[in-house]
């Protein structure tokens, strides 16, 4: 272990209490707004997509206060609403346009908190305030609900709350990491690199929204010193079976397929007078599920796994519950593996026998890809089709190799878990892939699109698209996310911050 390795590990341990404090507050903040009247500044959706401002305003102020940036103006909000902070060593003698540019990406929004359900099911845990009565905590529920929990004797390390596992811990780790890099600037922690940390918004509703904004409005005219060589995605990369803090190098893509079945409404006592879109639509859902169960029309990939399709959302337009409905709209969540395309995925739904049967019976069936039209908290509307591209960074890419090296230098000497023994911190680095989706889907662009300096930055070409090399490394167990009782083992914050603080200098060649 070099002196820089030892110093990074030492400071990451020193600042663990600070990281835990920041994470708890970032989780808690919506509690100040969700029950407050709107005319008094309240927001019942605070903390969810497009309602992140109170949380990221706290984070910006805290990042400045703890000296995770050199000066106040180095932490700011971009036009989309992402929180950005930047660190660089201006005295390292290397021109900015020759430095490696590292992005650390983590989203700040969460899924709906479901506060009442938390209290009802966990007994003594609030989705914002964490444990409020330890004597009432329903341990049996937590053990059944969550993918992994440490032994009960170690539960004092757990931080509970919506956003703990997915994925505020990654954002906090980035803040601690840039603080460490600045403190160890003289020892080479920032030599030859520029680090941009992005605390993005709207990821849960519209995966990759923050990076999509960058691709549209920033990268096409940006200086090379702004365009990333590598993106570290800090979404949850722990596995309940194989270990915490995996190094992930890919994920499947996903899309939404919307099906609208229009029928003819009538009184429920005379159903023969109408055409029931719910019944015909239900047949479409059933056939689609059967085809998926038989893997008809789905490809498989050795690394990313097979494509999937499941009904995920529905809306019924009906005059009453004693009538034949007028319209039934539902969506399929379609996960796309290598070799699958949005066009073919829509065509597969179009080709279902139940679609033809509905049309023959006189109903209208429309199949489309919906557009995301909601505005960010800053008022920016992307209007993007809800197609989110998968990506893979080759295992031999220098970014993956640097990630493995960073893990071995600052994490391996300080943990002793074994891969395959639950969601523990493992001594050996584990290179794998995500099951779910991340902000990474927002970075791929058409192969022929022009981005300054992309060629010399070793961007990855995947078919007709290209993207910066991406790796995943984040706190939280993937199988604990989006669940009642979501939690994080705070010890992951320490090692995640150490990794993020060490990776940039290794990638720049300062091993």
Where are these regions (language model features)?
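Acidic/His- and Gly-rich active-site-bordering loop/insert found
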Residues: 2-162, 183-193
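Short, glycine/charged-enriched secondary-structure capping and boundary segments
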Residues: 117-121, 175, 211-214, 245-249, ...
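Metal-dependent amide/peptide-bond hydrolase catalytic core
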Residues: 2-7, 11-14, 53-54, 237-241, ...
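Extended hydrophobic secondary-structure segments that form protein cores and membrane-embedded regions
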Residues: 103-104, 196-200, 231-232, 424, ...
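Short beta-strand segments
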Residues: 105-107, 199, 232-235, 262, ...
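Conserved acidic residues
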Residues: 99, 228-230, 468
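Acidic/histidine-rich catalytic neighborhood of metal-dependent amide-processing enzymes
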Residues: 152-250
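Phosphate-handling active-site elements
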Residues: 95, 139-152, 177-196, 221-225, ...
